Structure formats: structure tokens, C-alpha cells
Amino acid sequence: MASGYVYDPRHALHTHAQAPESAARLEGLMTYLQDQRALEGLVKLPVEPIPWSWIAAAHCGHYVETVRRLAEAGRARISVDTYLTPAAPAVARLGASSAVVATQAVLEGKVTNAFSLMRPPGHHAKSTQAMGYCIFNNVAIAAFYALREHGLKRVMIVDIDAHHGNGTEEIFYGSDEVLVISFHQHPWFPGTGDWYHSGAEAGLGYNYNIALPTWSNDQSYRLAFKEIVLPLAERYQPELILVSAGFDAHWLDHAAVLGLSGQGYYDLVAGLRALADQLCQGRLVLVLEGGYNLRSLGAGVVAALRALTGEPAPPDPLGPSPNPPVAPVGPGLTYLKGLMPFMRSPREPGFFDQPVEVPYQTK
């Protein structure tokens, strides 16, 4: 079965020429993907707007109506760092719909896995607040869709954007239906995502922040993946893996100060695909988040698509990061390991009894 992708040119109706997050960003990416023939052999999934009630699963109804009302009134911004246009509600709805369409196609067995190549991004959007170019939280809406419309009990979200997915964390902080793992630079925008923010009430032990030091590179990510993501996934036994796929952790992207490479992105997605293959029938959906340097965005997305389809890693046109990490990631990982017993496992006996094997080496 083939992999799928979602793209719709209507995203360009909502844009701002001076903003890093604009239509030009995604249009430039799609031109690069076509030049590289990266979408050949993939199934293009058509998208139509989902009901507003599905969006309100992640956002309170008052917030959704506020977005629509402010856009109709001609407001230029909904937050200090998130612009509005008259088309913003419809385009943000389409972005959320694309994540749902990709998830639906995977859950219904139409494609093996899928990538939603749409904008605006979503992982900073909280239940009642826009932030960081994000209006609706696409990956959270897709998770609620899987839980409510398909009856899933356990969804795992892995956020690989350079910035902490504070909106996703806030929406699921008290829930044990969704395991949230975020790789991000810390301290950095939006200022949240410390190691010790681990969930509350029923969600205690279901929120993991892999807070990475400046210039953390491929090796740092590999270590964190092995020490945290693998045992968590094995313990949690997800029925679906959703990925907030941000590409601004690349060393060439100045939206952050991290050191991931194109090869590093390939390894991350290949590792997640292997987890999905072993734990949840291959159910894996990537949802585009950040990535503002067109060269590194293109290289990262091509690498991710190759990993999704099971092809070998492409040549990395930009190479590895020239900068060493300023600090090791290990001490924080030790803390996160201590949280794992708080998460209930559907498997008996406990965790670490049958380690998952994935093609992701630490050296």
C-alpha cells in the first residue's frame, strides 16, 4: 500500500508578505518537492472542510467564534505574533481538515501512512488562544477525531518542531488518552516546556518534554529517541502515532539554535515509522508545523517522505551541523525516565520487557 499526502492550494488565500509563515513558504516547498520528484508514487488525498464542531473538540466554541468574528471585522491580528486575514478562519479550518483527512485515510486503510503538507501550523494554538502563527491546533484536532470518531483509546503525539508545542501540551495536559512527547530547544520561544511539566490528574506521566540545549544535534536526538521515545511507546502501546513535523530544528534554520540535519530528520521519521509498524499497524501521520528556511525545509521534508515510504535516505545536500552541542542532553533524560512508572500500561508485565527494535542507532 502506498503512502499518502494532503496539499491544497487554497492555503494561499491566507498570507502576509512580511511574515516568515506565509503562503510563499509552502509554495516554495511544493515547488522543491516537485523538482525532486519526491511526491511521485504517493496518493494525493482530497480535502474538504470538516465540521466546526470537530474543531471545537480541541478549542472551546467561544474561541472558534471569536476567530471568525474578528476576521470578518477586518482585524489584522488575533495575538501579538499571529496575523489574521479575512480568509484566515477558512484556511485554518482547511489546515485542520487536512490533518483529519490524512488521519482518516490511515485509520481506514486507504494508505499506509500520510503527510499533511498544509498551513498555517497549529501546535502553539491553545484551547482558547492563538499563538506563534497558529490559529487552530491541527494535530490535536486530528487526535480528537481518532478518539471520538474511530473509538481509539491511546494516541501518541511526537512533536519534533524546534519550539515547544505548548498548545498541544495544554489541551491534553490532564488526559491519559493522548501521550505527548515534545523535542524542542529550551529555553526558547514560547518559554514553556521544561522537563518537569509532566501532566496533571489523569494525565500525570503522559506529558514528556525533551528540553534540548542549544545546538543539540543528530546524536542528541538519537539518544533521546532511544532513551525516552522507545520505552514510552512500548509501555503505552499507541493505536496511532501523530507527528507535529516542524523542520526549524535544522541547523540552517535561524528560527531556533538547534543542530538537526536532513539525515537526522530521516532517522527520526524512520524510527517513528518502525514504531508504528511494530505497535499500531503502521498508523503514522505527519502534520507540517514550522520550518522557515526554504533550503533546509525542502531537504528535511524530502528526507521525511523517503522515510515514510521506506526508501533509503536521500543524499543530504546541506550536511551535518558544524556546531557542537553546548551541553549534554543526558541529565534531563534521567529525570524523564523517573516519570515513566506514573503512566499506566495496557501491557502486563510492565515496561522494558520486550524492547522495540528500530533502525535508529546511537552511534
Identify the function of each model-found stretch.
Residues 48-72:
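Charged, often glycine-rich, active-site loop that binds/positions anionic groups
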Residues 1-57:
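N-terminal low-complexity, Ser/Thr- and acidic-residue-enriched intrinsically disordered segments
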Residues 1-6, 11-14, 65-363:
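A general "terminal functional-core" signal
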